[in-house]
């Protein structure tokens, strides 16, 4: 990253025998820095902060020395700051705040110049000449639409730095549409590494768009934008990719849902805080008159973690369906089978089949991924007193923990649910029975005889299915 402002600090001594020598050294150093920035070709600003020692006094010629240094180096007065001595803590904080405010204005102007330069280059409508000679075998030149995506992306990032989120969103949207157009992503073969690189860039731009909309508190628009990207990529992968009936696609779906959950966790959305007990946010005024679907509203993070868990279930199911021949490492498979396997699976941001679900070694821990998403979702629902969904997620967590034989955590989740279960009073006997059997297995393996007897007594009810003891 090239800095917008290069801030340097220098101290001046009050010793008259060393003042001239030190001032000359400071001027020489500042001049060298200034010349170096000019030769680099970048528009980085240079700002100087001079600190005077504690025994100095403004009446002792300190201001004259500072003016002499500034004029000798040709520094703009707006970029040259003096911190007087013997100031209180409050005064120093005020000086620091004023300095940062002035430097911030220079940084904004720096990024405004860069954005103007990027828009000017895009408006030329020609492919720029390469700055370095192409290397045989490794050169990947861009087409004109590719350069347009590059310039739009740069303009959007510079607008983000200036906190102009509306302008940034428009530039990101333009870059997104050009990238997913018929002249770029759709003509890249899905076996090429550039295909996954282009998909990654599309995801990055979509995430940036979400960030801009959430920054501007356009929450419904952000959810719609999330769904729009999901639908566009689904259509693209179905038409020119490897389809959506594979573990790789559901790995992406799970990750895309988690992106929105992470956004909600990190952003200070006060209207959706657990203390408000709100499940979702009402639409903003600009779209309040439209007929919105429930899934177009911004729900709390638990909703998105639960969605991520559902796709992780599908990922595991597709992974377990991988044929044994494809689960072998490439070194143990014929070359022809390795070549055919390379074009059969979507491995965008996920492991190869022999790493996803290997024959002999431990592959991806799907249970851990699912359990992590379920527990996060359960925590969010519990904060908002959505007890029925908390019970459902607790049972889902218990199923995963049962497969790993973590009986202590199964007990921790199911004992409160079994003692205060609304499904029992409402006649949901199949759910009640499922909870009972799973809790009985955990109690038996935890040596809780009292709990085993109590559960057995309930399972002997005539309304339950035929009792088959499962130890």
Task: Describe each region flagged by the PLM.
Residues 1-471:
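Extended alpha-helical scaffold regions
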């Amino acid at each position: 990253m090239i800095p917008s402002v290069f801030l340097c600090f220098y101290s001046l001594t009050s010793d008259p025998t060393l003042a001239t020598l030190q001032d000359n050294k400071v001027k020489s150093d500042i001049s060298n820095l200034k010349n170096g920035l000019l030769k680099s070709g970048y528009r980085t600003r240079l700002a100087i902060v001079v600190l005077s020692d504690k025994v100095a006094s403004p009446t002792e010629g300190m201001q004259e020395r500072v003016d002499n240094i500034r004029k000798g180096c040709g520094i703009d007065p707006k970029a040259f700051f003096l911190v007087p001595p013997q100031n209180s803590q409050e005064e120093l904080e005020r000086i620091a705040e004023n300095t940062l405010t002035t430097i911030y204005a220079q940084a904004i102007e720096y990024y405004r110049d860069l954005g103007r330069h990027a828009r000017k280059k895009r408006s030329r409508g020609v492919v720029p000449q390469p700055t370095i000679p192409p290397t045989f075998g490794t050169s990947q030149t861009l087409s004109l639409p590719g350069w347009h995506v590059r310039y739009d992306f740069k303009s959007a990032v510079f607008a983000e730095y200036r906190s102009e989120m509306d302008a940034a969103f428009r530039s990101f949207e333009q870059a997104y549409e050009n990238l997913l157009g018929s002249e770029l992503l759709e003509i890249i073969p899905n076996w090429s590494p550039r295909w996954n690189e282009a998909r990654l860039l599309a995801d990055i731009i979509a995430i940036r768009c979400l960030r801009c909309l959430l920054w501007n508190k356009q929450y419904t628009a952000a959810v719609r934008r999330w769904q729009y990207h999901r639908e566009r990529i689904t259509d693209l992968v179905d038409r020119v990719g490897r389809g959506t009936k594979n573990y790789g696609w559901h790995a992406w779906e799970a990750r895309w849902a988690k992106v929105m959950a992470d956004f909600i966790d990190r952003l200070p959305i006060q209207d959706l805080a657990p203390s408000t007990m709100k499940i979702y946010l009402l639409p903003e005024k600009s779209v309040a008159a439209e007929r919105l679907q429930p899934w177009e509203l911004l729900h709390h993070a638990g909703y998105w973690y639960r969605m991520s868990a559902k796709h992780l279930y599908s990922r595991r199911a597709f992974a377990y369906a991988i044929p044994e021949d494809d689960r072998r490492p490439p070194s143990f498979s014929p070359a022809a089978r390795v070549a055919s396997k390379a074009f059969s699976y979507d491995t965008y941001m996920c492991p190869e089949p022999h790493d996803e679900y290997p024959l002999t070694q431990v592959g991806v821990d799907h249970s851990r991924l699912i359990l992590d998403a379920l527990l996060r979702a359960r925590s969010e629902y519990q904060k908002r007193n959505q007890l029925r969904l908390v019970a459902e997620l607790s049972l889902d967590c218990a199923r995963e923990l049962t497969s790993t034989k973590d009986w202590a955590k199964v007990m921790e989740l199911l004992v409160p649910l079994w003692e205060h279960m609304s499904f029992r009073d409402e006649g949901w006997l199949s759910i009640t029975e499922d909870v009972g059997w799973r809790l009985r297995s955990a109690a038996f393996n935890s040596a809780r005889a009292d709990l085993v007897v109590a559960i057995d007594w309930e399972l002997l009810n005539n309304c339950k299915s035929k009792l088959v003891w499962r130890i």
